């Protein structure tokens, strides 16, 4: 689902040579829907250095009419579309770069804003003593004052919180009469009190264990076989499903959050994103809110939604629900994906790998190959694309097998994150049009974490993780994503991510550059941020590049990220964001 990679560190990638398209430099003066000179006049004309994301093409100008590009080429050609007093003309020459607006191939803005609204969000620096002495008591007080039926929160750091602590007892000492649940920063772990564990049938109130074997997860037990309240992977989501989610996350709350999500996206330069867990609260309220927002004409981005299937669920029943959510489809809402977890994360030792971890374990595998193959076949037959979290190379092989044997190549079934992949699997991805939304933002690691990786990671993964360049080399369509809010000490904005793809380093931390052989070019990074996402979301004929006939979704960036010093790329921001020809954000 969500946040995978606890890359308390991390990275990203994109494309240099676009297979099948000649890479163009310089200008094209004839990308126009009408001949020049023309009697058609534009609503908007832009001059400047314009990166189109069509190959490496740079042009001087474009014209926009009724929300779409009608001309892309040189300045002289664009001038014919100007009607004095009616056409808005912006000369952005020398001020930065004009480029297509960006996309985020996998994120959880819906969940992030919901938790901010209904729960408590921790800082990564909040230590375990502060959690129990300040954060949880304050959250309980707030819940009781507002009449809430759950104390809910997110964001503790599983890398530093002890795993052998009895969280259940410590939470019970603070509050035992209403359920408590806090997920970790990745969303792969959770802690709960006795009240919630009893509701979920994990144990009796007297401590007697009941259902402690949850497929795809682990209910951690103490020396006496009694749950400690620490829940790994899908054991956490199973327990969380017993919360009163309809009350916790209503349609009204979802509607409120949509406006905040849009504000953040447009400010950062995103006008399309795929939400990796749209049914996070086990209901359809986010779908309903998005559909209503678009119907009201207030939506200034394109939303893709993935319906999550956990390995403890009835797959056929959930597939039917996911297919039914297509009723919420609209111009800017695309409910066309299902999401599932193949494994956990390599950083936490739950990624499914080969060779084994130094202590001899292999990680978590949530699905057999036969199950994945059957699910892929059923989903693709319903017109639903697979969107699968996978980190370890053994998990990648299993999913690629399933996509090849059960899927339709034209469905663009997608791997999400990918810490490690084997050479044979790269080639099969290319051969079968399997897409990747890459954890490029995590292609950096602190010096402290690098030392831990050398100790704890399998061979071949100690100093290498999150490939980027290899996807381009094999001709695999790759997009960028941030997994927000599970950014794991990494940036969410596109230009922060872009700098990491160039350097293997994150400006805000201390660490040797990470696996620089897999760094990519600036043009490749921009492709992954723009047209790569549009292709992943089946939008490339409408969006993702500056081309006549497409919607005019673009950015005026305050820095030329193609030529500025590489260590300054992260400073770039959108001076303005345009969606369908209209300015929807400006600094």
How does the language model describe each region?
Residues 12-23:
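Bacterial N-terminal signal peptides
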Residues 99-105, 416-417, 479-483:
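Active-site neighborhood of phospho(di)ester-bond hydrolases with catalytic His/Asp-centered motifs
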Residues 193, 269, 335, 344, ...:
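Conserved, mostly hydrophobic/aromatic
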Residues 377-386, 394-413, 423-427, 438-440, ...:
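His/Asp/Glu-enriched, well-ordered alpha-helical/loop segment
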């Amino acid at each position: 689902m969500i946040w995978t990679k606890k890359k308390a560190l991390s990275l990203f990638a994109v494309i240099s040579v676009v297979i099948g398209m000649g890479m163009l430099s310089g200008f094209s003066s004839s990308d126009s829907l009408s001949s020049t000179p023309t009697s058609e006049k534009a609503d908007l004309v832009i001059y400047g250095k314009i990166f189109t994301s069509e190959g490496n093409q740079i042009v001087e100008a474009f014209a926009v009419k009724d929300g779409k590009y009608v001309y892309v080429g040189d300045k002289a050609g664009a001038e014919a579309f100007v009607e004095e007093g009616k056409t808005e003309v912006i000369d952005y020459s020398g001020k930065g770069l004009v480029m297509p607006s960006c996309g985020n191939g996998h994120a959880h803005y819906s969940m992030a804003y919901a938790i901010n609204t209904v729960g408590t969000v921790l800082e990564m620096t909040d230590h375990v003593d502060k959690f129990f002495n300040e954060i949880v008591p304050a959250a309980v007080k707030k819940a009781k004052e507002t009449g809430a039926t759950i104390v809910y929160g997110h964001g503790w750091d599983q890398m530093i919180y002890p795993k052998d602590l009895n969280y259940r007892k410590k939470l019970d000492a603070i509050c035992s009469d209403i359920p408590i649940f806090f997920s970790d920063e990745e969303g792969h772990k959770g802690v709960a009190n006795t009240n919630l564990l009893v509701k979920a049938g994990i144990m009796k109130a007297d401590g007697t264990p009941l259902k402690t074997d949850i497929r795809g997860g682990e209910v951690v037990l103490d020396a006496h076989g009694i749950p400690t309240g620490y829940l790994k992977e899908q054991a956490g989501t199973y327990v969380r499903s017993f919360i009163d989610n309809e009350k916790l996350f209503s349609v009204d709350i979802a509607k409120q959050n949509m406006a905040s999500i849009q504000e953040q996206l447009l400010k950062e330069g995103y006008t399309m994103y795929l939400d990796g867990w749209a049914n996070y609260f086990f209901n359809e309220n986010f779908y309903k809110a998005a559909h209503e927002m678009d119907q009201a004409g207030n939506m200034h981005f394109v939303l893709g939604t993935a319906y999550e299937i956990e390995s403890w669920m009835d797959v056929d029943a959930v597939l039917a629900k996911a297919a039914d959510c297509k009723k919420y489809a609209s111009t800017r809402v695309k409910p066309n994906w299902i999401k599932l977890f193949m494994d956990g994360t390599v950083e936490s030792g739950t990624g499914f790998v080969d060779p084994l971890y130094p202590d001899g374990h292999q990680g978590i595998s949530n699905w057999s190959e036969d199950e994945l193959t059957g699910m892929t076949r059923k989903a693709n037959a319903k017109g639903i694309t697979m969107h699968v979290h996978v980190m370890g190379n053994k998990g990648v092989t299993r999913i690629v097998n399933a996509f090849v044997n059960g899927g339709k190549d034209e469905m663009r079934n997608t791997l999400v994150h990918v810490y490690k992949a084997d050479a044979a699997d790269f080639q099969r991805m290319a051969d079968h049009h399997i897409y990747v939304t890459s954890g490029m933002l995590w292609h950096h690691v602190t010096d402290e974490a690098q030392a831990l990786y050398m100790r704890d990671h399998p061979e071949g993964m100690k100093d290498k993780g999150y490939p980027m360049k290899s996807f381009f080399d094999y001709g695999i369509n790759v997009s960028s994503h941030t997994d927000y809010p599970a950014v794991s000490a990494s940036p969410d904005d596109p230009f922060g991510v872009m700098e990491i793809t160039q350097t293997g380093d994150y400006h805000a931390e201390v660490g040797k550059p990470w696996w620089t052989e897999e760094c990519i070019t600036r043009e490749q990074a921009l492709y992954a941020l723009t047209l790569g996402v549009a292709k992943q979301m089946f939008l490339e004929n409408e969006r993702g590049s500056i081309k006549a006939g497409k919607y005019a979704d673009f950015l005026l960036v305050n820095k030329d990220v193609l030529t500025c010093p590489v260590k300054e790329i992260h400073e770039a921001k959108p001076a303005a964001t345009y969606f369908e020809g209209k300015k929807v954000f400006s600094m």
